[in-house]
C-alpha cells in the first residue's frame, strides 16, 4: 500500500514540477521583450517613430490648422493693437513708437507661426539627444530569468512535498497571468505617450499664434511647457527602467522559489506603476497643465 501511495506521490510531484517549470520558463519573456524595447521607443523622434503618422499629422497641421492659426493670429494682433492704443490714456498720449512696437510683435508672431513645425521638432530633437545620452549611461540588463535567479530549480522542486508544490503551481499560474497584464500596461504607457505627442503637435500653430499677446500668451507658453514635459517624460521613463535593471540584478538567489517569483513580480509591477507616474511628474516639473 505504501508503495502505491509513494508511486502516486512521485507521479503527482513530477506533474506539478513539470507544470511549474513550464509556467516559469517563459513567464517574463513578453515582459522582458517589452521592457527591452522601451529605450529604443522613447529615444525616437516623432518622425523616426512612425513616418506615416508623422507625415499625416504634418499635412493636417499645415493644411488645416495653420490657416485657422492665421485667423487667430490676426484677431490676437488686432486686440494687441487696441490694447496698446487704449493703454496710453485713452488716445490722449499716443506715440508713434507703439506702432513700431506692434509691427515688430506682429512680424515676430508671423515668424513663429510660419516656423511652428521647425520649433516643435527642434524641441523633440533636443529631448532625443538627452534621452540617447542617458541610455548609454543608465540602461543595463533588464531581463528576468527565474531559472538564473533560483539555481537548480527542478532539483529543488523535487525535494518539496506535494502541498507546497501545489501552492507554488497556483502561484506560478497567477503570476504568469499578471505578467501579461503588466506587458499590456507597459505597451499602453509607451505607445500612449507617442500618440499624445502626435495629438499635441497636430494643433501646434494655434497656441503658437498667441505667443505675442500679453493676455493670450499664456496659452502658447503652457503649450511649450507641455512639449518639454512630453519630451522629458522619455528621460524619466529611462530613469525608471535603469532603476528597474539595478533591482532585478540584485534579486537574492539564496531565498526560496516563491520569494524569488514574487520579488520579480513586485519589481515589474513597481516599474509599471512608475511608468504611469512619469507623465504627471514631467508636467509638474515644467508646470504644464
Regions found by a protein language model. Name each.
Residues 1-72, 88-97, 107-178, 217, ...:
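Gly/Ser-rich, low-complexity
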Amino acid at each position: 500500500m505504501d508503495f502505491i501511495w509513494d508511486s502516486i506521490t512521485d507521479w503527482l510531484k513530477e506533474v506539478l514540477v513539470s507544470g511549474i517549470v513550464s509556467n516559469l520558463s517563459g513567464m517574463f519573456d513578453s515582459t522582458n521583450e517589452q521592457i527591452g524595447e522601451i529605450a529604443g521607443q522613447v529615444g525616437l523622434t516623432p518622425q523616426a517613430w512612425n513616418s506615416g503618422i508623422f507625415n499625416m499629422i504634418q499635412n493636417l497641421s499645415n493644411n488645416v490648422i495653420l490657416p485657422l492659426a492665421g485667423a487667430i493670429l490676426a484677431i490676437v494682433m488686432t486686440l494687441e493693437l487696441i490694447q496698446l492704443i487704449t493703454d496710453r490714456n485713452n488716445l490722449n498720449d499716443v506715440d508713434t513708437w507703439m506702432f513700431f512696437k506692434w509691427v515688430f510683435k506682429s512680424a515676430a508672431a508671423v515668424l513663429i507661426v510660419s516656423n511652428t513645425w521647425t520649433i516643435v521638432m527642434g524641441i523633440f530633437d533636443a529631448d532625443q539627444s538627452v534621452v540617447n545620452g542617458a541610455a548609454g549611461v543608465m540602461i543595463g540588463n533588464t531581463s528576468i530569468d527565474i531559472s538564473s535567479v533560483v539555481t537548480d530549480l527542478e532539483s529543488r522542486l523535487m525535494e518539496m512535498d506535494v502541498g507546497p508544490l501545489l501552492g507554488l503551481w497556483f502561484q506560478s499560474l497567477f503570476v504568469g497571468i499578471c505578467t501579461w497584464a503588466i506587458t499590456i500596461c507597459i505597451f499602453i504607457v509607451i505607445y500612449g505617450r507617442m500618440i499624445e505627442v502626435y495629438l499635441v503637435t497636430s494643433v501646434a500653430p494655434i497656441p503658437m499664434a498667441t505667443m505675442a499677446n500679453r493676455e493670450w500668451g499664456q496659452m502658447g507658453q503652457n503649450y511649450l511647457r507641455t512639449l518639454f514635459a512630453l519630451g522629458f517624460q522619455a528621460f524619466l521613463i529611462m530613469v525608471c527602467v535603469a532603476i528597474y535593471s539595478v533591482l532585478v540584478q540584485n534579486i537574492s538567489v539564496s531565498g526560496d522559489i516563491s520569494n524569488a517569483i514574487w520579488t520579480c513580480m513586485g519589481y515589474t509591477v513597481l516599474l509599471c506603476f512608475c511608468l504611469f507616474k512619469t507623465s504627471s511628474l514631467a508636467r509638474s516639473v515644467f508646470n504644464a497643465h
